[in-house]
Amino acid sequence: MPLLDSFTVDHTRMNAPAVRIAKSMVTPKGDTITVFDLRFCVPNKEILSERGIHTLEHLFAGFMREHLNGDSVEIIDISPMGCRTGFYMSLIGAPTESIVADSWLAAMQDVLKVAVQSDIPELNEYQCGTFEMHSLEQAQEIARNIIASGINVNRNDDLSLSEEILKGL
């Protein structure tokens, strides 16, 4: 099985909250697609709550689009990581980490403005596979923690696992 890019970085050295360009590629038509690692928690030390990350999934995708989409950027998808330490965001364009971080902080401010659980988008059995597994309170606690901590940048060069280490794993 091929080694995926996300497993070639040392998770023991990742900072959180932090933005990392996980991958960048150019399509045959010349569009740049960038995948960002939006790391909310320090891997293997913290984890996002099940209900909190699910609620963030519903809120974060819309709020990030409001703050980041523009003439040169269009978000394709924002999805939670299986390890529950953050989200991957795929987009057309190549915004800087600082622009993404600013949009992320603004989106977290928006999460805090959601007044009641019933304001969570797509919170029904028709549009959500586990519509009862949500917590606005937990999502807002996550948002408060991100805002209080600020957002750093993780760089692949600083986190890259050597070929020797990868062969030994």
From Swiss-Prot:
Listed EC numbers: 4.4.1.21
Keywords linked to the UniProt accession: Autoinducer synthesis, Iron, Lyase, Metal-binding, Quorum sensing
Cofactor note: Binds 1 Fe cation per subunit.
Enzyme class of the recorded protein, top EC level: lyase
Obligatory cofactor(s): Fe cation
Gene Ontology process terms (BP): quorum sensing
UniProt-annotated binding residues for Fe cation: 54, 58, 128
The keyword Transmembrane appears for this protein: no
GO MF, any single term: iron ion binding
Recorded catalytic activity of this chain's protein: S-(5-deoxy-D-ribos-5-yl)-L-homocysteine = (S)-4,5-dihydroxypentane-2,3-dione + L-homocysteine
InterPro entries for this protein: LuxS_sf, Metalloenz_LuxS/M16, S-ribosylhomocysteinase
Top-rank taxon: Bacteria
Family: Belongs to the LuxS family.
Subunit (UniProt): Homodimer.
HAMAP family: LuxS
Reported function: Involved in the synthesis of autoinducer 2 (AI-2) which is secreted by bacteria and is used to communicate both the cell density and the metabolic potential of the environment. The regulation of gene expression in response to changes in cell density is called quorum sensing. Catalyzes the transformation of S-ribosylhomocysteine (RHC) to homocysteine (HC) and 4,5-dihydroxy-2,3-pentadione (DPD).
Official protein name in the record: S-ribosylhomocysteine lyase
Native source organism of the sequence: Shewanella halifaxensis (strain HAW-EB4)
